[in-house]
From Swiss-Prot:
UniProt entry keywords in alphabetical sequence: ANK repeat, Repeat
InterPro entries in alphabetical order: Ankyrin_rpt, Ankyrin_rpt-contain_sf
One of the Pfam families matching this protein, by short name: Ank_2
ANK repeats: 31-61, 72-101, 103-131, 133-162, 163-191
Protein's organism: Acanthamoeba polyphaga mimivirus
Record-given protein name: Putative ankyrin repeat protein R810
Amino acid sequence: MVCDIYDALPVEIWIHIIELSKEFNLLLTNTKFIKLYYLVKTHKSILKKIVKNGYFENLKYIIENRIIVITNINDVLLLACKYGNLPIVKYLVSKGADICAEQNSPIKNATYYGHLDVVKYLVSNGAKFFGSYSSAIIIASSSGKLDIVKYFVPGKIYFCLEMEIALVCATENKHTNIVDYLNSMRSSYFDKCFNFIACLVKNFLPSIYVY
C-alpha cells in the first residue's frame, strides 16, 4: 500500500511534501521512501529520530545498504546510549563503534540518563571511568539514578573523596533517596572499620608490648 502511494507522485513532489510538512517519519515507512534521505534537508533530524525511537531495523537497513553514510559511528553510539536502546548499542559496537570514545562518553551518557541495562553491557565489554567507577557514582548521584549508584557501589567500599563528592551532589540536587543510601553505606563502612580496628587491638597489640 505504501509503495503504491510512493509511485503515485513524482519524487520531487514527495520531497516538497516531506520538507514542508516536516513529516520525516514518512522516510521510515518503506525502502523507497528511505532512499529520499539525501534529497531531504533533514539528515541529523532523521538519524536522531531513528535512534531515539528505537527503530532498530530501519537503522540496520540504512547502514547495511549504505543509504546513509555515517562518517562517525561513535556519534550514533552516543545517541543510543543517551536514549537507552540496548539492541542499537550492541549493533553499533558490532559495527566497530568504540565504547570508550570521547573519554568514555558512551557509559557516561548511559549513566547520566539512567539506562542500567546499557551501563551493564558497556562495563561487561570493558568500558571504564578513567580506571575506576568512582566518577560513575558522582554522575549517577547528580542525576538521581539510585539503581545505577547501587550498581557501582561495591559491598566493601572505601569512601574516598569521590564518594564524598557524590554525597554532596545528591544533596544539592535534592535526591534524598541517594543521600540516605550513601549515608547508610558510609555508616556501614565505618562500622566495619571500627570493628576491624577493635579486633586488631584486642588480638595483636598486647603481644608486642615489652615488659
